[in-house]
């Protein structure tokens, strides 16, 4: 099996898979009571063997994902609904298995915002100018100070998110890039919390090197405290 064949969440740094770096953060966050991990079906056995080596107490289930991110999230929500794992008004957080540089403080802030206000996205400031193009021409320039990069985790009332996904299914909508986009489309006011700038999604070799750089930096800072 080559590295190119392996899903990115299973790439390792310091002897630990990226997905485990992610779960470690949620496992350590006090307000998180349970974790459902959604995974490419053909890699479920590999994931379960990986997690069996860890002493996780909050991982409730590992289940198969779908053909799209939207379908994978719905599979996770459906599992929770079917097995009555949470009350209808419970806050649920949706996170990427390849976004390991999240921290407990941001996870908690996102959960609190979702509980107190409504659907919440973790964001980071846009550091470059955002333009809209059409036919090779710039047709709009958005004021950078008002732009944010939508990231994860994203927090929701479980019942509201589940019902929105059911509505999308009924309408044959399979094109939502994330659940925040879905909730906004269906009329919900969406709130934001600031997350760490390094909270990137690892999708390229350069992203992985950035991840390694931040991990090395944190280790260096601990040594020289």
Where do the PLM segments sit?
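N-terminal glycine-rich phosphate-binding loop and ensuing alpha1 helix
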Residues: 1-44
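Conserved donor nucleotide-binding strand/loop of the catalytic core
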Residues: 55-69
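Residue-level signal for inorganic ion chemistry
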Residues: 10, 19, 76, 96, ...
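Short helix-capping segments at alpha-helix termini
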Residues: 29-31, 52-59
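Conserved beta-loop-beta/alpha segment of the NTase-like Rossmann-fold superfamily
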Residues: 67-133, 151
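Short aromatic/basic micro-patch
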Residues: 12, 101, 141, 155, ...
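Short, flexible, basic/aromatic active-site loop/helix in glycosyltransferases
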Residues: 132-156
């Amino acid at each position: 099996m080559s590295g190119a064949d392996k899903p990115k969440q299973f790439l390792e740094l310091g002897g630990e898979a990226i997905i485990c770096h992610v779960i470690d953060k949620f496992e350590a966050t006090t307000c998180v009571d349970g974790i459902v991990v959604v995974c490419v079906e053909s890699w479920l056995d590999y994931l379960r063997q990986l997690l069996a080596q860890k002493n996780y107490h909050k991982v409730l289930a590992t289940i198969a994902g779908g053909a799209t991110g939207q379908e994978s999230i719905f599979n996770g929500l459906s599992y929770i609904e079917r097995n009555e794992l949470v009350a209808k008004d419970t806050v649920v957080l949706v996170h990427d298995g390849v976004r390991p540089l999240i921290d407990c403080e941001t996870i908690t802030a996102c959960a609190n915002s979702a509980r107190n206000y409504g659907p919440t996205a973790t964001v980071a400031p846009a550091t470059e100018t955002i333009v809209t193009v059409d036919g090779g021409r710039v047709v709009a320039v958005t004021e950078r100070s008002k732009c944010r990069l939508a990231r994860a985790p994203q927090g929701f009332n479980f019942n509201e998110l589940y019902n929105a996904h059911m509505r999308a299914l009924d309408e044959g909508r399979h094109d939502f890039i994330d659940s925040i986009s879905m909730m906004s489309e269906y009329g919900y006011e969406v709130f934001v919390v600031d997350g760490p700038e390094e909270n990137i999604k690892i999708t390229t070799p350069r992203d992985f090197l950035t991840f390694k750089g931040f991990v090395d930096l944190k280790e260096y800072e601990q040594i020289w405290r």
